[in-house]
């Protein structure tokens, strides 16, 4: 009787331990790995292909710092147009990542621009391109022959106010 009880408990424990492994495997396989590249840390995935990195500081109309959210990366596609309206939308998402629905974008710094730095294989030197932020916008260039993951950086101050 004791042998049967021990055998039953052993089988039961093995059954539960394998079910937890199966659940972890199925949960991890549901993540779409094609859109992201694994970085150094197992919990960090960066977008593959071009991306817009938004790193802003939220200030009031007098220049006093109100919010300094972490940077946020958004996948973008070559050939798409980034207008001022779209960029403000991305900035608001970055603000929401720190203080959800608390602030709205009033205005981007007039000197704000988006920059991308890459090694130009034709010129054989590092190249930096700047794109002004306008209502008309700019077309995201295809830099795939020079770099796999071009990061278009927006690093600026943004005038914000409470909603």
Swiss-Prot record:
- The organism's place on the tree of life at top rank: Viruses
Main location (coarse class):
secreted
Q: Does the keyword Secreted apply?
A: yes
Keywords of this protein's UniProt record, alphabetized?
Answer: Plasminogen activation, Secreted, Signal
A GO cellular component annotation here is: extracellular region
Signal sequence: where?
Answer: 1-27
| Cellular location(s) | Secreted
Chain ranges passing through the membrane: none
General function of this protein: Potent plasminogen activator that converts plasminogen into plasmin. It forms a 1:1 complex with plasmin, which in turn activates other plasminogen molecules.
Q: Which family does it belong to?
A: Belongs to the staphylokinase family.
Q: What is this protein called?
A: Staphylokinase
């Amino acid at each position: 009787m004791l042998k049967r009880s021990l055998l039953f408990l052993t089988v039961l424990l093995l059954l539960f331990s394998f079910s937890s492994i199966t659940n972890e495997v199925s949960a991890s396989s549901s993540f779409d790995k094609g859109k992201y590249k694994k970085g150094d840390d197992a919990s960090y995935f960066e977008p593959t292909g071009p991306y817009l990195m938004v790193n802003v500081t939220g200030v009031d109309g007098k220049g006093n710092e109100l919010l300094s959210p972490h940077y946020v990366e958004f996948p973008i596609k070559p050939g798409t147009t980034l207008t001022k309206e779209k960029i403000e939308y991305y900035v608001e998402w970055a603000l929401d990542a720190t203080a959800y629905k608390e602030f709205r974008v009033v205005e981007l710094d007039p000197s704000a621009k988006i920059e991308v730095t890459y090694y130009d294989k034709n010129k054989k030197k590092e190249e930096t391109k700047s794109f002004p932020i306008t209502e008309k916008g700019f077309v995201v260039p295809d830099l795939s022959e020079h770099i796999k993951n071009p990061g278009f950086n927006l690093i600026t101050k943004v005038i914000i106010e409470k909603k």
